[in-house]
Amino acid sequence: LTSPTLAARLLDVIEHDILPLTARGVSLGNKVFGAAILRKSDLSLVVAETNNELENPLWHGEVHTLKRFYELGEKPNTKELIFLSTHEPCTMCMSAITWAGFDNFYSFFSHEDSRDAFAIPHDLKILKEVFGLEPGGYRRNNAFWNSYFIADLVEGEDDPLKTTLKAQTARIKAAYDDLSTSYQSSKSGNDIPLN
């Protein structure tokens, strides 16, 4: 999907739906990762969630979002949905998205951002140690799904929308930077296995 409103809508969902949940989660000691599921037809929000590893180390943002999605009564078919991840999914989350039948996912931050800007290198370490892959070494477009970076969608927009979306991107990055600082200062007190 490359509708001219897609980049704007995904950024709005991150800023207004996922970030508040993540701020609450980080205040409890969870990591900064979140996700949401939207309808392709009208870009309406189905569910948004955030990391909840203090409850269960498998409740990464994406997997916790899938858990909440499957707890809904009536659910759309996953082929009719967009999967939005604040951070490029780790291998567990990519597999969960695949097993759930999604044909896409969109990410705001990359694995390299998780390592460099958030001091959480585990995604890249697992890709290297378990699968022998360098950063970006997995197939971002494959028989199961196509993945996209929101920054690429923003770059494809025309001004003045592009300028507006870049300003929103900067605001979101600043908010995540603050949340990351908060998480990093408190993580020694949690019992998350790969904190």
Where would I find each of the regions flagged by the language model?
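Zinc-dependent deaminase
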Residues: 1-25, 100-195
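Short, acidic/turn-prone active-site loops that include or flank metal/cofactor-
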Residues: 53-55, 63, 109-114
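Short beta-strand scaffold segments in enzyme catalytic cores
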Residues: 33-40
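Local cysteine-cluster metal-coordination motifs and their immediate loop/turn environment
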Residues: 84-103
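Flexible, active-site-proximal loop/turn residues at the rims of small-molecule/cofactor binding pockets
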Residues: 42, 89, 111
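Short beta->alpha transition motifs characteristic of CBS
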Residues: 46-54
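Short, flexible loop/turn motifs enriched in small residues
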Residues: 28-32
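Mobile, glycine- and charge-enriched loop segments
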Residues: 62-87, 177-195
